[in-house]
A protein has these predicted regions:
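Membrane-lumen/periplasm interface segments of specific transmembrane helices
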Residues: 130, 306-395, 494
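Short periplasmic/luminal acceptor-recognition loop of GT-C membrane glycosyltransferases, typified by
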Residues: 584, 588, 592-629, 646-657
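Transmembrane-helix signature of polytopic, membrane-embedded enzymes
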Residues: 34-44, 183-184, 200-225, 242, ...
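Membrane-embedded, hydrophobic transmembrane alpha-helices
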Residues: 1-99, 480-513, 522-533
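Perimembrane helix-loop-helix junctions
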Residues: 283-315, 509, 513
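Hydrophobic, aromatic-rich transmembrane alpha-helices
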Residues: 21-22, 195-201, 292, 370-423, ...
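Membrane-interface helix-loop-helix junctions at transmembrane boundaries of multi-pass membrane enzymes
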Residues: 100-108, 205-213, 257-261, 295-309, ...
Length: 701
């Protein structure tokens, strides 16, 4: 009961601080963007995300990275925004009502509401009300966040992937930091996906694309396995695509506005993009370079210097903490990648020999590109696949020809150069083909090769739809019909996948089978939840007069629903956590395993020498767990054990993963019986206790 009371108390603090932050950020955003709902929403989310990263960076640098400090700092920033920026006088953003426009506008808004409602229903069903099951989320996205909370230290090295940039993980931290468990971690990418829809819509508005085609483009981007899977996980490829389109959209607004205002929002998007993951640096540099070229051509050196100064400042403030941390702790900002010419040790080549051939630029051939094309068609569907291929193809003539001969088509040229640059980044991205030389394991799984290029798919889709809208007349009408048919097929296919009716695409179906208990459950609840959420949205939009008169009653009702949801999530999370993961891994619960291995009642330090070790941390994040990065030799195994001084070591009997990172650990344990007390548990897992720990427990003080 105490845990539930704690979670409810934290909810009150969280709601107050976030309310202040969002309202203050909205006032700042209102000064930067037009009076439109999607534009204001997108700008507000970018500002809120930037504030979250900025607060975490400074509190982590000062050694005060605690949930209470973090949340109170956000509240202070929100209060300051409200004091500094007065409310706008142009009223409520347009686009709120559903049934008051023409038939076409009504259909567009109904379609938009259903699309957003289906995404929210998907997250609530498979993200919030289910335990995390995604491989990368269990391996490092969630453990990183839990280690931050356990140690109140942004620089701790307890996770093997401690070195990755963490701007997207900070979104997870924002949702779960003060709670007793990670039961709201499934909300991480919901607002990232909604931000993607908003910036795609805004980018197409700048291209003067009709509303129906804008809706089709949003459906095309969202009805993909990348969005469907990452909506309910903590992966960050969706964030890369979102921030790429966001930076492009806001940067073009700055260029088209004759650079009257500083490009705050575009620079924030660039800074956030730099801090998502390493390959996102390439996409960020593409946007910086293309915008600098356009600014130089239209505004001269002064505009270019303004743009570059804003970008560098944003990168330092919003991403500098990650690269500075790596440089400080390991001597290279891109650890484990080093640069021998600069005197930086390169551990990446030792960890992944032959990894330079995992890019399409060096390792691609006709057969690989054929498999990649099928992977894109399967994972992204016909409309997104066609839009991506079309966008990449038309970017070359548009970018080269219209740059000189058609100055009125500058926006298409802008999108074309971004697409060309993104294509170059994708073909140079590591691990698209494989993570282990000669296996083509990533390409065989299809999904991973596609998710690394989802940012390219997003910007190419925007270019494709903008090009179709630009071609007026019969050609444009024909292309519009083709696009509409493909989008319809795409949406139907992915909807049937979500409802468990078909096995297409393969990887997404496998993921859904591991989440839903059976197809009947998905078939019944997924459309039901979608319709319910859409109805709530319709009622709220059409009864704003009633809501304004009964705001107190509506607020109390919403708060009551939130409190009930928090209490239920907290109780369910802790009650079934151990049993869920033990059944999933076909093993006893970790608590019983630890109790059997230890000889006293102290809380042990556990060294996890396997990949998906999230469940070992416990539902309350109560266990002290470390996962080493790389142990290529038996001496390295001994060195890691000596460094971390674990009470228990947990590993597999045989490491069957492609990289064989922990293959030598069971061999070391088997070959040194004098150093370990071995304990076999549940087939796959090997649990060992160092004898010096056992002896220290037995000796009386």
């Amino acid at each position: 009961m105490f845990v539930v009371v704690w979670d409810l108390s934290w909810t009150v603090l969280w709601a107050v601080s976030v309310g202040l932050l969002v309202s203050g950020s909205h006032r700042f955003a209102a000064l930067q963007v037009p009076d439109r709902l999607t534009s204001r929403f997108a700008a507000t989310l970018v500002v809120v995300w930037s504030c979250v990263v900025l607060v975490a960076s400074f509190s982590g640098f000062l050694g005060m990275f605690h949930p209470w400090v973090f949340q109170l700092s956000l509240a202070v920033i929100g209060f300051a925004f409200r004091r500094w920026f007065p409310p706008t006088r142009n009223g409520r953003p347009t686009g709120m009502r559903i049934f008051s426009k023409s038939g076409r506008q009504r259909a567009v808004r109904l379609g938009s509401a259903l699309m957003v409602s289906s995404m929210i229903a998907h997250v609530l069903m498979y993200g919030v009300s289910r335990y995390p099951v995604d491989w990368d989320s269990l391996a490092y996205h969630l453990p990183i966040v839990d280690h931050w909370i356990q140690t109140a230290d942004l620089f701790n090295q307890r996770c093997a992937f401690w070195y990755v940039p963490g701007n997207n993980e900070l979104v997870t931290y924002f949702w779960v930091a003060g709670y007793s468990g990670d039961f709201f971690a499934g909300l991480t990418n919901l607002f990232v996906a909604l931000l993607l829809l908003c910036v795609v819509n805004e980018a197409l508005i700048d291209a003067r694309v009709p509303a129906v085609m804008r809706l089709a483009a949003c459906f095309s981007v969202s009805a993909t396995s990348v969005v469907s899977r990452q909506l309910i996980s903590q992966e960050n490829d969706l964030a890369v695509a979102t921030l790429l389109v966001s930076a492009a959209c806001f940067a073009w607004r700055w260029l088209a506005d004759d650079r009257q205002r500083l490009p705050y929002l575009a620079a924030m998007s660039i800074g956030l993009l730099f801090g998502i993951k390493y390959y996102a640096i390439g996409y960020a540099l593409v946007v910086v370079g293309v915008v600098a070229a356009f600014a130089l051509r239209t505004g001269g050196w002064k505009s270019t210097a303004t743009w570059l100064t804003c970008c560098v400042t944003a990168i330092v403030l919003l991403a500098g903490v990650w690269y500075g941390r790596n440089w400080l702790l390991e001597g290279t900002p891109l650890f484990p990648k080093g640069f021998k010419a600069l005197g930086m040790a390169d551990q990446w080549d030792a960890m992944r020999p032959g990894n330079r051939f995992s890019t399409l630029m060096r390792g691609g051939d006709a057969e690989i590109f054929r498999k990649l094309s099928w992977a894109w068609a399967e994972q992204d569907g016909p409309s997104t696949w066609l839009a991506t291929m079309t966008g990449v193809c038309v970017s070359i003539p548009i970018g080269l020809y219209y740059w000189w001969s058609k100055p009125k088509q500058n926006y298409l040229v802008f999108l074309a150069w971004l697409t060309l640059g993104s294509t170059c980044v994708y073909v140079m991205t590591p691990n698209v083909i494989e993570t282990v030389f000669g296996t083509q394991n990533m390409l065989a799984m299809r999904y991973h090769s596609v998710r690394f290029g989802f940012a390219l798919a997003a910007i190419a889709t925007v270019l494709c739809f903008a090009t179709v809208a630009w071609h007026r007349g019969r050609l444009g009408q024909f292309l519009g019909i083709v696009v509409a048919v493909l989008v319809g097929v795409d949406v139907i296919l992915h909807a049937t996948v979500a409802m468990g009716l078909t096995a297409w695409p393969t990887m997404f179906r496998i993921e859904m089978k591991s989440i839903a208990r059976d197809a009947g459950e998905a078939w019944f609840f997924w459309p039901l939840a979608t319709v319910d959420i859409a109805l709530i949205y319709f009622i709220a939009c059409e009864s704003k007069g009633w809501l304004s008169r009964h705001m107190r009653t509506a607020g109390i009702a919403c708060a009551g629903l939130v409190f009930v949801g928090v209490a239920y999530a907290s109780l369910t999370w802790h009650r079934q956590y151990e049993s869920f993961y033990s059944a999933r891994d076909t093993r006893p619960t970790w608590q019983s395993t630890i109790d059997a291995a230890m000889v006293d009642e102290s809380e042990p330090r556990i060294m996890a020498c396997f990949y998906r070790y999230y469940s070992l941390l416990g539902s309350y994040r109560q266990r002290d767990v470390v996962r080493p990065l790389y142990m290529p030799t038996l001496d390295a195994v001994q060195q890691e054990i000596h460094q971390w001084q674990p009470d228990i070591i947990v590993t597999f009997h045989e490491d069957r993963h492609w990289t064989k990172t922990y293959a030598l650990v069971p061999e070391w344990i088997q070959n040194h019986p004098e150093a370990f007390r071995q304990r076999d548990t549940a087939g796959r897992f090997l649990v060992a206790v160092p004898k010096h720990k056992e002896m220290s427990h037995d000796v009386s003080p």
